[in-house]
Amino acid sequence: MQSTQSTESNLLPLVPAYDSILALAPYQTGKPIEELTREYGVSDVVKLASNENPIGCSPHVTLAITEQIGQLSRYPDGNGYYLKQALADFNDVNVDQITLGNGSDDLLDILARSFVGADDAIVYSQYAFVVYSMLAKMQGAMDVEVPAQRFGHDLKAMSQAIENNSNTKIVFIANPNNPTGTQLEHGELREFVASVPSSVLVVLDEAYIEYSPESNNRALLDEFDNVVIVRTFSKAYGLAGLRVGYALSSAAVADLLNRIRQPFNVSRVALAAAAAALADQDFIEKTRLINDEQMHWLEKQFDALGLGFIKSHANFIMVEIAVEMEDTNAAVIYQALLEQGVIVRQLEVYGLYNWLRISVGVAEDNMRLIDTLRSILTDD
């Protein structure tokens, strides 16, 4: 990556809006299968890095997409009428409480652009989604990282951080949390929201809510006007390649977000696919059952290998590569897995140098992972 100084000199006489943008590193996605094939010549690849649905998407989605093929020259419905109607019914909210996005990342960005300025602050937890810090830097704002508690959110400390920083405009909470998989209970979240000034937006990032439906905090919307819930169709619904998400909020907040979002920010194919996916809750139940079964199997395998892990409420698990194991730190294991066609996720960007995040796959992929991991650890 280029240094801040070299990037700045290369830009001149152009100058970015905020100096903090120069400190940003481009977001690193999970390594694509195609990239691994190019680099290592491996054709049989198992990707367990990006928390995608290993069984794909609902068959109803395929039909819905096919029906849109003849309409690709036409712009989509910019308001997403039919998808919003379906989401309103599903979540028991009014249509005017919904904002659609090009994935949930788009909505997080819209929220930051709508509410955060250069003199403001964004509060978030250590070991929470790295994009939260990036959003603060993009806005030239202060990013306030609160130390984690048992790899999860320390709500009392976060409340104190908001009190200490009166310029706080947004506090982000991922529940279940990415990348650790920890979960907050509804009661403690409600108590936290009640402690936050009404001028601070509490954004609940529920990208993995389908894997932990008991942590659904939809009821908070009825009680607090400063709560926004952001969800995605990229994970359990299996539409990561189409990019579609949604936000639930008060009508007033949604009105503002819809003023800021780009026109036609969700494609016609994505709108149709998301509506079809939402209608097939049997598929979501199947997804959840497979995930639970395979998660339990993986936990037993990690125990047998002597590897620690954090109990997860999502579709991934964070695994510790023991520090005392010579030449087997996470970076070494990550590279060795790549060379054998298995992609997982490094967590160095979070400061978790001895941990890997592993998505839960289907049985065949999980067995391939464990066999490869066992072979690497044994050889070392």
UniProtKB/Swiss-Prot annotation:
This is Histidinol-phosphate aminotransferase 1. Homodimer. Its cofactor is pyridoxal 5'-phosphate. It comes from the Bacteria. Belongs to the class-II pyridoxal-phosphate-dependent aminotransferase family. Histidinol-phosphate aminotransferase subfamily. Disulfide bonds: none annotated. Its EC number is 2.6.1.9. One of its GO terms (molecular function) is pyridoxal phosphate binding. It comes from Psychrobacter arcticus (strain DSM 17307 / VKM B-2377 / 273-4). It is an enzyme of class 2 (transferase). One of its GO terms (biological process) is L-histidine biosynthetic process. The modification N6-(pyridoxal phosphate)lysine is found at residue 235. The keyword Ligase does not apply. It catalyses: L-histidinol phosphate + 2-oxoglutarate = 3-(imidazol-4-yl)-2-oxopropyl phosphate + L-glutamate. Pathway: Amino-acid biosynthesis; L-histidine biosynthesis; L-histidine from 5-phospho-alpha-D-ribose 1-diphosphate: step 7/9. InterPro entries: Aminotrans_II_pyridoxalP_BS, Aminotransferase_I/II_large, HisP_aminotrans, HistidinolP_aminotransfase, PyrdxlP-dep_Trfase, PyrdxlP-dep_Trfase_major, PyrdxlP-dep_Trfase_small. Keywords: Amino-acid biosynthesis, Aminotransferase, Histidine biosynthesis, Pyridoxal phosphate, Transferase.
